[in-house]
Swiss-Prot record:
The lineage of its organism: Bacteria, Pseudomonadati, Campylobacterota, Epsilonproteobacteria, Campylobacterales. It holds the Pfam family Flagellin_IN. Flagellin is the subunit protein which polymerizes to form the filaments of bacterial flagella. Important for motility and virulence. Signal peptide: none annotated. Keywords: Bacterial flagellum, Secreted, Virulence. Transmembrane segments: none annotated. GO terms for cellular component: bacterial-type flagellum; extracellular region. It is found in: Secreted; Bacterial flagellum. This is Flagellin A. Belongs to the bacterial flagellin family. One of its GO terms (biological process) is bacterial-type flagellum-dependent swarming motility.
Length: 510
């Protein structure tokens, strides 16, 4: 080994190693003081990239959780508001049911109608004033809204809230045909009740015999309403064209039961002789009689069977009755199998065909002419005003005529019996619509809850993954620090010894 003075290789080596140790010691102190393994890109370039990506993902997930909670807050505000609206609709239905019985007077029905109008106004007020951050929720404007629920773009949940004001809910499709005057068997098929499938009902015989008639058909339709979505109402009423006149009836026959001659009938049947004679055989004919305020004779089927009535010409005086049902001559016989009203609790058309006529839809298939059907759609807002002639006709309130001209107005809301029945259906339809909206929102809220649960766990796992990369292992780094600290001390000693060794060369000069 050569002895050199100008270059102290040992000292240089000791210095280099001490410098490396100082750098390692500096890194250890930086990590221990910051708690991070990666304090700069040079510490772990690829690890820093992954850690920064994970940190960004975790931060975005935190905001996504906040977004989802905001969305659930919006849904809860709307849900509670609709809950109040449903309570209002339930009250409307109860009051309409209260009005749907003839123990009510016109004045009491008007009082009930006033209550209903106020309730609907309250419902509209809720629909128009329920807001979140200035956005109306129940007016129909809150549609196709998105809530970002992920760390990356287009990871969103969409939500829409339909309008719940009275002009947008409670749609009811009602249709009524003219008098059925032909007997026979009717087998109905409701087309595409769920958009795809048809429902065929059992065959019903329409006649004037017991256990048959349009009333039985209505019962068959109603017991299948859960499958078809359609309810039926049958009305079999024969009405004289004019008031009962003073006179007699000859050889009166009603639904095959011979009542014979009825003499000395007074005008408007003021002494009830004609009505009493007919009602005496109600158990056999299935028909009850009464006179209305105009003095006209009304025959009503109590079980929905048809009404067949015939008299002979009176030879020795005036006849008390000559025409019924808008021009049917009693001497030629009057046949009335009634009117059928169908109601669907939405705005969709009622598509029905019969086995005998599968080419026509609707009432034409049952035996009505093309122009012998009144149809219309009403909604909850219509309850607050007067029902127009179209509603009167389509609801069957005018009894024997398809069009309501010449009949008294149906009035407003529940101020008439038939109007109250219509309001019951409207309220039920409105409740179903609100329940559907609430159900959809409930599904969205459940989706949001599941999303929050998932991304909360994901956020924790992402932070854990970032921590594995970015955070320092204190046990490991403490060991490194202690090692480097000892090396630093030994390095200082080594440098001093290297200088001492170099001084030994001076002894050669002595």
């Amino acid at each position: 080994m050569a002895f050199q003075v100008n270059t102290n290789i040992n000292a240089m080596n000791a210095h280099v190693q001490s410098a490396l140790t100082q750098n390692a010691l500096k890194t250890s102190l930086e990590r221990l003081s910051s708690g991070l393994r990666i304090n700069k890109a040079a510490d772990d370039a690829s690890g820093m990239t992954v850690a920064d990506s994970l940190r960004s993902q975790a931060s975005s997930l935190g905001q996504a959780i906040a977004n989802t909670n905001d969305g659930m807050g919006i849904i809860q505000v709307a849900d509670k508001a609709m809950d109040e609206q449903l309570k209002i609709l339930d009250t409307v239905k109860v009051k309409a049911t209260q009005a749907a019985q003839d123990g009510q007077t016109t004045e009491s029905r008007k009082a009930i109608q006033s209550d209903i109008v106020r309730l609907i106004q309250g419902l509209d007020n809720i629909g128009n004033t329920t807001t979140y951050n200035g956005q109306a929720l129940l007016s129909g404007q809150f549609t196709n809204k998105e809530f970002q629920v992920g760390a990356y773009s287009n990871q969103s949940i969409k939500a829409s809230i339909g309008s719940t004001t009275s002009d947008k809910i409670g749609q009811v499709r009602i249709a009524t045909g003219a008098l059925i005057t032909a007997s026979g068997d009717i087998s109905l098929t409701f087309k595409q009740v769920d958009g795809v499938n048809d429902v065929t009902l059992e065959s019903v015989k329409v006649s004037s015999s017991a256990g048959t008639g349009i009333g039985v058909l209505a019962e068959v339709i109603n017991k299948n309403s859960n499958r078809t979505g359609v309810k039926a109402y049958a009305s079999v009423i024969t009405t004289s064209d004019v008031a009962v006149q003073s006179g007699s009836l000859s050889n009166l026959t009603l639904n095959g039961i011979h009542l014979g001659n009825i003499a000395d009938i007074k005008k408007n049947d003021s002494d009830g002789r004609l009505v009493a004679a007919i009602n005496a055989v109600t158990s056999e004919t299935g028909v009850e009689a009464y006179t209305d305020q105009k003095g006209r004779l009304n025959l009503r089927s109590i079980d929905g069977r048809g009404i067949e009535i015939k008299t002979d010409s009176v030879s020795n005086g005036p006849s008390a009755l000559t025409m019924v049902n808008g021009g049917q001559d009693l001497t030629k016989g009057s046949t009335n199998y009634g009117r059928l009203s169908l109601t669907r609790l939405d705005a969709k058309s009622i598509n029905v065909v019969s086995a005998s006529d599968s080419q026509h839809l609707g009432f034409t298939a049952i035996g009505f002419g093309e122009s012998q059907v009144a149809e219309t759609t009403v909604n909850l807002r219509d309850v607050t005003g007067n029902f127009n002639a179209n509603v009167k006709s389509a609801s069957g309130a005018n009894y024997n005529a398809v069009i309501a001209s010449g009949n008294q107005s149906l009035g407003s809301g529940v101020t008439t019996l038939r109007g109250a029945m219509v309001v019951i259906d409207i309220a039920e339809s409105a409740m179903k619509m609100l329940d559907k909206v609430r159900s959809d929102l409930g599904s969205v809220q459940n989706q949001m809850i599941s999303t929050v649960n998932n991304i909360s766990i994901t956020q924790v796992n992402v932070k854990a993954a970032e921590s594995q990369i970015r955070d320092v292992d204190f046990a490991e780094e403490s060991a490194n620090f202690n090692k480097n600290n000892i090396l630093a001390q030994s390095g200082s000693y080594a440098m001093s010894q290297a200088n001492t060794v170099q001084q030994n060369i001076l002894r050669l000069l002595t």
